[in-house]
Amino acid sequence: MVEKKPAVRSQDPGQRRVLDRAARQRRINRQLEALENDNFQDDPHAGLPQLGKRLPQFDDDADTGKKKKKTRGDHFKLRFRKNFQALLEEQNLSASEGPNYLTACAGPPSRPQRPFCAVCGFPSPYTCVSCGARYCTVRCLGTHQETRCLKWTV
């Protein structure tokens, strides 16, 4: 009879990596930076030749009805569009008395943070030892360890 090999994941729960609070925070910051850099998009018209031809529109709108005529203001808004970093730098250079994007913030919460399960969203009394994510039941813990623990979707 052929012996079955045990699954690598279920060999020994003591072999799972345990991260301290600082390592968890570094991991979360690295994941957030990767998300910030992930969706960066350049101008889709940048590589196309401009020989007086009309450039294609890369809009996802599927309007088959009447088309709205673009006004001159819309033309300049589309042509001289700025990215988020350029808008922040412009706002920092202009002196304004009121709160801006960098100075506006909410005060600390008056109540403690409510812990919710990372898998199903219900209130969770337990925390994963390895990564610090919350879970509510053994079933959610199993799902978390199989699919999410120490991966990009904590």
UniProtKB/Swiss-Prot annotation:
Keyword Secreted attributed: no
Compositionally biased spans, kind Basic and acidic residues: 14-23
Keyword Zinc belongs to the record: yes
Binding residue positions for Zn(2+) 2: 128, 131, 144, 149
GO biological process: calcium ion homeostasis; chromatin remodeling; heart process; hematopoietic stem cell homeostasis; intestinal stem cell homeostasis; muscle cell differentiation; negative regulation of G0 to G1 transition; negative regulation of transcription by RNA polymerase II
GO cellular component, one term: nucleosome
Stretch list, region Disordered: 1-73
GO molecular function, one term: zinc ion binding
Cited PROSITE patterns: ZF_HIT (PS51083)
Keywords in alphabetical order: Chromatin regulator, Coiled coil, Metal-binding, Nucleus, Phosphoprotein, Zinc, Zinc-finger
Residues covered by region (Interaction with NR1D2): 72-110
Modifications the protein undergoes after translation, according to the UniProt entry: Phosphorylated on Thr by MAPK11 or MAPK14. Phosphorylation is required for MYOG induction, for deposition of histone H2AZ1 at the MYOG promoter and for SRCAP complex integrity.
Nuclear localization signal, short sequence motif: residues: 38-47
Annotated zinc fingers (HIT-type), start-end: 117-149
CDD domains: zf-HIT_ZNHIT1_like
Main location: nucleus
Coiled coil feature spans: 23-39
Residue(s) carrying Phosphothreonine: 103
Binding locations of Zn(2+) 1: 117, 120, 136, 140
PANTHER family the record matches: ZINC FINGER HIT DOMAIN CONTAINING PROTEIN 1
Subunit and interaction comment: Component of the chromatin-remodeling SRCAP complex composed of at least SRCAP, DMAP1, RUVBL1, RUVBL2, ACTL6A, YEATS4, ACTR6 and ZNHIT1. Interacts with MAPK11 and MAPK14. Interacts with NR1D1 and NR2D2. Interacts (via HIT-type zinc finger) with the RUVBL1/RUVBL2 complex in the presence of ADP. Interacts with histone deacetylase HDAC1. Interacts with histone H2AZ1; the interaction results in recruitment of H2AZ1 to the MYOG promoter region.
Biological function: Plays a role in chromatin remodeling by promoting the incorporation of histone variant H2AZ1/H2A.Z into the genome to regulate gene expression. Promotes SRCAP complex-mediated deposition of histone variant H2AZ1 to lymphoid fate regulator genes, enhancing lymphoid lineage commitment. Recruited to the promoter of the transcriptional activator MYOG at the early stages of muscle differentiation where it mediates binding of histone variant H2AZ1 to chromatin and induces muscle-specific gene expression.
Family: Belongs to the ZNHIT1 family.
Name the UniProt record assigns to this protein: Zinc finger HIT domain-containing protein 1
Organism encoding this protein: Mus musculus
Gene that encodes it: Znhit1
